[in-house]
């Protein structure tokens, strides 16, 4: 019941009481009507609305700060007509303000389409929906809020910056034999495996990898020797500071997306491994869309361990190795393991967390990490607020055979 309905009810009590005291029956009837009217309208708004809501998003994947059109289709699945109702779409904050929709009266079986536009302000897989309806009577005495189930999503891809192209890296990481470079990360007895797709020949199922991953894996046809690369992303919450686009984590995701895009364009076989990923079999990046979708959904995790990254690097090195690029926070006890497991070509972008912290004091942790990584055979650079990824990459990759 709205405030207006409560006022009607209160006024009805006063008028009815006055009518009884004064012996004015007509006044008493008016008071009773004022008392009953809010309750009658409340009952009317409690009637179920047989509405079905579906929506489509075009396009379903957009870059940062791009627009997407959302079409909402509302259908009356009942036999009775529905009243005019106001609706509000539930949106993630990164997609802007919630749009308000006016849904007209719908006869039984009738449907209407309504369209609105959203703009992507932040990376991620953002839900759209459900639709919240506000059902009210014509007098505004009662109202009811109903959420109609059903959701869609919009994938906002990370930024990708152009980087200098990699040249002169041999298959398998420079100097490795063609045979070893073809060894898959899933085991030395198979050329390569991937997840099962509908239509694959069941005779190609690789049972050992299936048992290890818990998912059906099949052998791929042997591919020509290609250069291989592993991109490591430190997604530990303790490794980053700042929020939004100005935060260190978004800088790291942009770096990972840009590096993966570069490597795939240079026809590398790329593997991507965040710190939060469970250790075990490393799955290859099947396409650029696959990599960007994964990086769009990545988020900070409360884990404080880099064991997942260390195991990924050890697995990669054990089965042929190749070019390794890491986007790390400050590293401490994990350094020894990481350097021991290193590939012959390791590049590291090290986030200076204190520099991204408002009022933070420089403890030299990032510099210490760079020094220890360099001692272990890596090339490493410190990343601070305002660091240009293309410039950092160009400086970091000097001597690796990079053309600009």
Give the label of every model feature segment.
Residues 26-27, 36-283, 323:
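An amphipathic, basic-hydrophobic helix/alpha-beta surface used to engage anionic
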Residues 8, 149, 165-167, 198-404:
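Exposed, interaction-prone extracellular/peripheral surfaces
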Residues 1-48:
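A eukaryote-biased signal for short, well-structured alpha-helical docking elements
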């Amino acid at each position: 019941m709205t405030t207006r309905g409560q006022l009607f009810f209160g006024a009805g009590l006063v008028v009815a009481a006055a009518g009884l005291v004064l012996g004015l029956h007509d006044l008493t009837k008016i008071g009773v009507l004022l008392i009953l009217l809010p309750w009658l309208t409340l009952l009317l708004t409690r009637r179920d609305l047989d509405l079905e809501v579906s929506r489509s998003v075009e396009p379903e994947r957009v870059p940062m700060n791009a627009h997407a059109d959302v079409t909402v289709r509302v259908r009356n699945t009942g036999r009775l007509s529905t009243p005019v109702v106001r609706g509000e779409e539930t949106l993630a904050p990164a997609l802007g303000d919630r749009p308000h929709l006016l849904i007209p009266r719908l006869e039984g079986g009738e449907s209407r389409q309504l369209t609105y536009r959203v703009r992507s302000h932040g990376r991620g897989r953002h839900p759209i929906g459900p639709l919240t309806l506000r059902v009210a009577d014509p007098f505004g005495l009662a109202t009811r809020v109903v959420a109609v189930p059903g959701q869609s999503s919009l994938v906002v891809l990370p930024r990708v910056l152009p980087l200098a192209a990699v040249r002169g890296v041999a298959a398998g990481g420079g100097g490795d034999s063609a045979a070893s470079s073809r060894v898959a990360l899933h085991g030395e007895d198979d050329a390569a495996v991937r997840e099962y797709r509908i239509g694959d020949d069941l005779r190609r199922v690789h049972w050992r990898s299936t048992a290890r991953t818990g998912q059906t894996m099949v052998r791929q046809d042997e591919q020509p020797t290609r250069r291989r690369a592993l991109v490591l992303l430190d997604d530990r919450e303790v490794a980053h500071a700042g929020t939004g686009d100005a935060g260190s984590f978004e800088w790291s995701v942009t770096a990972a997306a840009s590096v993966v895009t570069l490597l795939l364009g240079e026809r590398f076989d790329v593997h991507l491994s965040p710190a939060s990923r469970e250790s075990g079999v490393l799955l290859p990046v099947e396409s650029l869309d696959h990599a960007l979708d994964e990086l769009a959904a990545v988020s900070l995790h409360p884990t404080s361990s880099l064991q997942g990254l260390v195991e990924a690097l050890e697995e990669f090195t054990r089965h042929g190795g190749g070019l390794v690029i890491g986007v790390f926070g400050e590293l401490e006890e994990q350094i020894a393991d990481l350097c021991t497991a290193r590939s012959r070509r390791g590049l590291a972008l090290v986030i200076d967390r204190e520099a991204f912290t408002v009022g933070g004091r420089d403890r030299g942790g990032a510099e210490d990490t760079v020094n220890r990584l360099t001692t272990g055979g890596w090339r490493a650079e410190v990343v601070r607020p305002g660091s240009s990824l293309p410039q950092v990459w160009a400086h970091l990759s000097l001597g690796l055979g990079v053309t600009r």
